[in-house]
Amino acid sequence: MKKANRSAGSVPKVSGISKPQTVEKSKSENSSSAPTGGKPVKPGAAAALSKTKSNDDLLAGMAGGVNVTNGVKAKKSNCSSAAPSAPAPAMTISESKSKSSTGTSSSAKRSTSAGNKESSSTRERLRERTRLNQSKKLPSVSQGANDVALAKRSRSRTATEGDIRMSKSKSDNQISDKAALEAKVKDLLTLAKTKDVEILHLRNELRDMRAQLGISEDHCEGEDRSEEKETIIAHQPTDVESTLLQLQEQNTAIREELNQLKNENRMLKDRLNALGFSLEQRLDNSEKLFGYQSLSPEITPGNQSDGGGTLTSSVEGSAPGSVEDLLSQDENTLMAHQHSNSMDNLDSECSEVYQPLTSSDDALDAPSSSESEGVPSIERSRKGSSGNASEVSVACLTERIHQMEENQHSTSEELQATLQELADLQQITQELNSENERLGEEKVILMESLCQQSDKLEHFGRQIEYFRSLLDEHHISYVIDEDVKSGRYMELEQRYMDLAENARFEREQLLGVQQHLSNTLKMAEQDNKEAQEMIGALKERSHHMERIIESEQKGKAALAATLEEYKATVASDQIEMNRLKAQLEKEKQKVAELYSIHNSGDKSDIQDLLESVRLDKEKAETLASSLQEDLAHTRNDANRLQDTIAKVEDEYRAFQEEAKKQIEDLNMTLEKLRSELEEKETERSDMKETIFELEDEVEQHRAVKLHDNLIISDLENTVKKLQDQKHDLERENKTLHRRLREESAEWRQFQADLQTAVVIANDIKSEAQEEIGDLKRRLHEAQEKNEKLTKELEEIKSRKQEEERGRVYNYMNAVERDLAALRQGMGLSRRSSTSSEPTPTVKTLIKSFDSASQVPNAAAAAIPRTPLSPSPMKTPPAAAVSPMQRHSISGPVSTSKPLTALSDKRSNYGEIPGQEHLLRTSSTSRPASLPRVPAMESAKTISVSRRSSEEMKRDISASEGASPASLMAMGTTSPQLSLSSSPTASVTPSTRSRIREERKDPLSALAREYGGSKRNALLKWCQKKTEGYQNIDITNFSSSWNDGLAFCALLHTYLPAHIPYQELNSQEKKRNFTLAFQAAESVGIKSTLDINEMARTERPDWQNVMLYVTAIYKYFET
């Protein structure tokens, strides 16, 4: 506000500046109308000419005349008082003024020529007319002054009424503000029309007065005239010198104030650019700004070329706050009165207000009339500084727009990744729902089958009671068998009751768990809907930011066009200034010629010369008044600039606070989303753990049901035996001795068969041990041979390293391809083996249980494969080590192939040592830098395999009393036992679910490690892996990967021998992509990206890039 007060305080100086500025400006304007040839000058003016001190004083003395001076003063007062009453319709008045001024100058020239012709013929008649005109002149001037005073009163009255209306309208609401603004605009328009009529009337009177005064002054030859001239010539030079000094001081003050305003405007603009905001962002409607800027080039030259003073604002006639009110009202006025005739005036006013907003440096650097005459070097320096500042501001704006585009792309990429992950979570939730429904159906089936079995058990119990009653009726003695088996029956009944009670309790627990899971799923679906709504709001926010960026780009183009137009305007002003300077020089030369003619004594035609000089002086004074009005207009513009800058600062503070609030709201929303995602992750993990617990409970129920089926089958056998006993008890005594003899013979035969089976087993064991020893010996020989070959290879490499480098690289690539093919073959075989095994369902298990009840021996022998079978061990990545290490490793890996084949052939006895040996070779050949399988896990598998082999030996040695069929069955079940004794069999359900999830989605573990979404976790992993590499800045999955250096740096951390990173350059995109993709393909990672498309586009598809980086992470880190 201090700046505004200071600039507003400088406004009253306009009235003091007007007269000297008029004199100085008239020098350059009247040079064209001065006569080149002259008549003899009269000797009566010699005394006046001798008193002149300079050419400027000579002009003032030769153009003397009280009446002319008074007329000019009246004209200036009329113009200066008419201007502030109608600032809005400035353009229309200025155009009419320029036209009328040109008409006045032409009519004055014609009247001057006619007066010169008449003066030669009728001098006597004109003397009397001049006396009459002198007497009439004073009333006409007083009448003009009265008109001016009336106009001032009417303007002050209308201005005060407008201020009262404005003060009232500010306290009302927006509707009343709009109505008041419309009423004020109408008043201003009507006032402008009335002022136009008054100005035209005054111009006509002024034209008549000029014509009359010109004729009368041509032939003024009296003593009064000479005395007046002498007094004016005596007093005028001192007045001119004082006014010139005052004008120079005021010009320097104005120049310093403009420099200060320019510096402050630049500082504010630099601060705004540093903060990242442009001045046109605070406009409510950007299209208004573009319309104002398009109109501004037409208005600025018109204001500079105005001949009248309609835009000058004086202190006496202007009401306080009128400029501020217009600045606050111009937008609503534009919206309400687009159909009025004076729309151009309001547009010009708006453009004058908003031009400093768009290019304030250019507006401040535009030279005023006094500066253009006095200091051209300062003008040129200002022009250069304004051009540099505008270029710097445009460059800062371009850089800011580019940065906002990058942030926008990164935000949109992150939003798309979040949407994709939410869709995946929704799909997983649906799968869990379907799995839960399936488990519920299976549970219902299990409960139904359990009820059926309990009904069967009760039915069989009733049958047993019936059979016992029958035995009691026939008095058959079964007391011995009942005594023997009664304890077992009681125990079985007690166990059955306990199992039934436990089944009921577990059923109630399962129902509660199912209800809890259903409620949790409902809550998760509701949270998912809320998250989708939040994502939609974020999408709308991103679209809004895109529209803002487009509007900023349009504003940038409009700024550039306005800058060019301003440059053209300044160039035209410079040309006009040079022309005026040339005219001033010519005028000085003519004045010198007149002075020489006057001194020569030829004074015959001095009155004609004085008349022409007086006309030139009038023109110069009109020009000076116009320049004075331009200066006042410039001050008004400076005041408007100060007010506009203050308003922009207030709006910027408000915008900054609003932006901070929005950022805090967005941060809070982001934290809420993160917390909700974490809660969903925990709920999902809890649901998975609950599902795995339910699977364990289902397996327990299956085992219990199998046991119950066995009990039921025993009871059925018991019933059959009781029925047989009913028919065979009478013949039991007769056949007892014969059965004893047959059983003794069978026992002896069984012992002989058992001995032969033991001999065969010992032979097979000795053969297997001999084969194992042979294989160990061959392995030892192969290792020694491999060591010799490696030593020879090292010697050859030390001697011929430079010659054999190409062959070693070719051999390395061949070995890597073989290993990749071997790895792919193992993966295909693994997948085929896993896919070929059908998963057991509840219905198939129930059918198997029902069939087992009919065939108990077969059910006891068949053991189903558990779902907790271990995954096959991965081979170490051959490409993660150097080529020589891969060459040394490939030997033992290739020699381990016959071991696996032999272990497959002899799965009964040779599998355990073969697997143990394979684990040892793989653990020794794997590099220490990238361990795929932990050492503790391999030790566990080795210890488990040893225990299983020892237990199998003890079972074989202890099974001397078993049959060969049971021995073979035990041999076939031994691999299943060894598989079930793997380390994964003892894993908890939560870790087992985590392992399955990581195999299905490798980024889930990464998201748990780094937190947040999968996309952000993978981005953080890439940043961590490429930390320390030069020219790498990974912020997204599109533009950060467009030169190929990020791929090369990421693969260089694993494959340093394939990528010479120090030799790479960001300009050679195709070479970088080729090296990275070839290195990835050499280890088996298929390239899903096109090299040409990646090298051509600046922003590749982020989803394809993310998939490829995910493949790299999956290969090397999982």
UniProtKB/Swiss-Prot annotation:
Keywords: Cell cycle, Cell division, Cell junction, Coiled coil, Cytoplasm, Cytoskeleton, Gap junction, Phosphoprotein. The keyword Coiled coil applies. Residues 120-131, 158-171, 947-957 have a biased composition (Basic and acidic residues). Its main location: cytoplasm. It is found in: Cytoplasm, Cytoskeleton; Cytoplasm, Cytoskeleton, Spindle; Cell junction, Gap junction. Residues 168-281, 395-450, 488-808 form a coiled coil. GO terms for cellular component: actin cytoskeleton; cell-cell junction; cytoplasm; filamentous actin; gap junction; microtubule cytoskeleton; microtubule organizing center; spindle. It holds the Pfam family CH. PROSITE patterns: CH. Residues 1-50, 75-175, 294-324, 359-391, 916-999 are annotated as: Disordered. Belongs to the cytospin-A family. Involved in cytokinesis and spindle organization. May play a role in actin cytoskeleton organization and microtubule stabilization and hence required for proper cell adhesion and migration. May interact with both microtubules and actin cytoskeleton. This is Cytospin-A. It comes from Rattus norvegicus (Rat). The gene is Specc1l.
